Amino acid sequence: MASQTIEILVEGGKATPGPPLGPAIGPLGINMMQVVEEINKKTADFGGMKVPVKITADMDTKDFEISIGTPPTTALVLDELGIESGSHEPGTEVAADFSVEQAFKVARMKFDDLLANDYKHATKEVIGTCVSMGINVQGKDGRETQKDIDNGDYDDVFTQ
């Protein structure tokens, strides 16, 4: 069984046979509309976010499997905040303020893809992403909030 795998980012629920999907899967000879419909069905909950999609096609039978990853942490943070982008000058310009609870929510969504062994450290990873995006956490620089988490200031959030 010869198979080929394509990995691509598509907008949740809005995949089309056009670029970038069409040119990537067209040469595989699989039914493009079936692929598009299945991707849209599986990514509908991630509307407006870029979602990693992995398409594995059997070159002999033209069957395919689609697996959906979770959107990048940045996309989940932006979606949670309801904004379109982070700061253009992180460190000097603040784009928004994020709460530890929101960071925890994103950490739960991304947990399997993160390096952390527990939700507390996963939340700190998400907060690190916020720092690079110019997003404050709890009204201050995310690095300070990470120290507060280490000091146990937000332990009640992680026991929910």
Curated annotation (Swiss-Prot):
Keywords: Ribonucleoprotein, Ribosomal protein, RNA-binding, rRNA-binding. One of its GO terms (biological process) is translation. Residues 141-160 are annotated as: Disordered. It holds the Pfam family Ribosomal_L11. SUPFAM superfamilies: Ribosomal L11/L12e N-terminal domain, Ribosomal protein L11, C-terminal domain. One of its GO terms (cellular component) is large ribosomal subunit. CDD domains: Ribosomal_L11. Residues 151-160 have a biased composition (Acidic residues). PROSITE patterns: RIBOSOMAL_L11 (PS00359). GO terms for molecular function: large ribosomal subunit rRNA binding; structural constituent of ribosome. The keyword Metal-binding does not apply. It comes from the Archaea. Residues 141-150 have a biased composition (Basic and acidic residues). Part of the ribosomal stalk of the 50S ribosomal subunit. Interacts with L10 and the large rRNA to form the base of the stalk. L10 forms an elongated spine to which L12 dimers bind in a sequential fashion forming a multimeric L10(L12)X complex. NCBIfam families: PRK01143.1. Belongs to the universal ribosomal protein uL11 family. PANTHER family: 60S RIBOSOMAL PROTEIN L12, LARGE RIBOSOMAL SUBUNIT PROTEIN UL11M. Forms part of the ribosomal stalk which helps the ribosome interact with GTP-bound translation factors. This is Large ribosomal subunit protein uL11. The gene is rpl11.
